[in-house]
Amino acid sequence: MALLEICCYSMECALTAQQNGADRVELCAAPKEGGLTPSLGVLKSVRQRVTIPVHPIIRPRGGDFCYSDGEFAAILEDVRTVRELGFPGLVTGVLDVDGNVDMSRMEKIMAAAGPLAVTFHRAFDMCANPLNTLNNLAELGITRVLTSGQKSDALQGLSKIMELIAHRDAPIIMAGAGVRAENLHHFLAAGVLEVHSSAGAWQASPMRYRNQGLSMSSDAHADEYSRYVVDGAAVAEMKGIIERHQAK
């Protein structure tokens, strides 16, 4: 049966995902940045309360995946922390200036991760040559690759995802970016074994007082009175679709 991973940005969202049938959680911070490393406090609280597998993302900033020496040192430290806290896996990825996997740095990450399952995130979608990259990731011992098939969403990239799945000795290919209940059947019919979804929506802040003349963001148009939350009903709907597909 296909595995359902839900992207979560808080301990509460991880619990919602678990209660509604998620098989695994990718734990992140900063949804508007596409997911950054969660704080130590969030990591500890999730580790204590969530019982399904949780894989934290290790990404020190938004933007590209070519990191300075200082940023890479922080990545290694965060990998060690996640391992010490007892998480079963993590999500990360590093590219070089030419859009190839930075093999030297990824080897250091794999050594620091030890027995943890490592997912190479959507840095894969920014690489120059996906098939060569897939071979490199297999050589590194990467467990799975999260990809939209190098398109803006996974449905558009489904043909490339199918090509990657068919590639010999490839890691597990997990489809992600825009995967929802309404299009999930396309991925299941294509034989995708793992899907990744945010399964959520922006929720208004409970704050009644709002200082509309001041923003804490450099983006003047940012809505600072909303937060992204997992929709339990959406998770349950996706899980039900997967179970019904398996029963056919």
Swiss-Prot record:
GO terms for cellular component: cytoplasm. Keywords: Cytoplasm. NCBIfam families: PRK11572.1. This is PF03932 family protein CutC. HAMAP family: CutC. The gene is cutC. It comes from the Bacteria. One of its GO terms (molecular function) is copper ion binding. It comes from Shigella dysenteriae serotype 1 (strain Sd197). SUPFAM superfamilies: CutC-like.
